[in-house]
């Protein structure tokens, strides 16, 4: 579960290494974000020469959460870290590669480009 001030890794090759959540999108009372939700975040650490710069405000979609959650079929899934992928205004990823596994829930949220770039979908 991601909320304001949560820090997470970046799972793409935009050059950003760490994000800090500023806002969870989806209404004024929305407090938590899980897999497939969109957030507004700022880049806290970045590699030099990358397209994402430190201090830049970006949109990102959550691809992994450390908190375990139950799927409708009864299975439970939990990842080792919190991670997000930086997206543009149209919802397409800014990077050209995605690192690490992503959750199957992204397919239901219509993030097909992220699903196709990911090395593993759990």
Swiss-Prot record:
User: Which GO terms are recorded in the biological process aspect for this UniProt protein?
Assistant: translation
- Offer an example of a GO molecular function term for this protein: structural constituent of ribosome
Q: Which GO terms describe its cellular component?
A: cytosolic large ribosomal subunit
Q: Which Pfam families match?
A: Ribosomal_L14 (PF00238)
Name the residues that span the membrane: none
Keyword Phosphoprotein recorded: no
Keyword Ribonucleoprotein recorded: yes
Keywords per UniProt:
Ribonucleoprotein, Ribosomal protein, RNA-binding, rRNA-binding
Q: Which superkingdom, per the lineage?
A: Bacteria
Q: Which Gene3D superfamilies does the protein's record reference?
A: Ribosomal protein L14
Protein family per UniProt = Belongs to the universal ribosomal protein uL14 family.
What is this protein's function?
Binds to 23S rRNA. Forms part of two intersubunit bridges in the 70S ribosome.
Name of the protein in question: Large ribosomal subunit protein uL14
List the source organism.
Herpetosiphon aurantiacus (strain ATCC 23779 / DSM 785 / 114-95)
């Amino acid at each position: 579960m991601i909320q304001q001030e949560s820090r997470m890794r970046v799972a793409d090759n935009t050059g950003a290494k760490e994000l800090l959540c500023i806002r969870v999108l989806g209404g004024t009372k929305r407090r938590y974000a899980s897999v497939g939700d969109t957030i507004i975040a700022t880049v806290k650490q970045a590699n030099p020469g990358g397209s994402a710069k430190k201090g830049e405000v970006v949109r990102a979609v959550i691809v992994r959460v450390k908190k375990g959650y139950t799927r409708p079929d009864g299975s439970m899934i939990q990842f080792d870290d919190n991670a997000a992928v930086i997206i543009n205004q149209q919802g397409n990823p800014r990077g050209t590669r995605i690192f690490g596994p992503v959750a199957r829930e992204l397919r239901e949220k219509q993030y097909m480009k992220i699903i196709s770039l990911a090395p593993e979908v759990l």
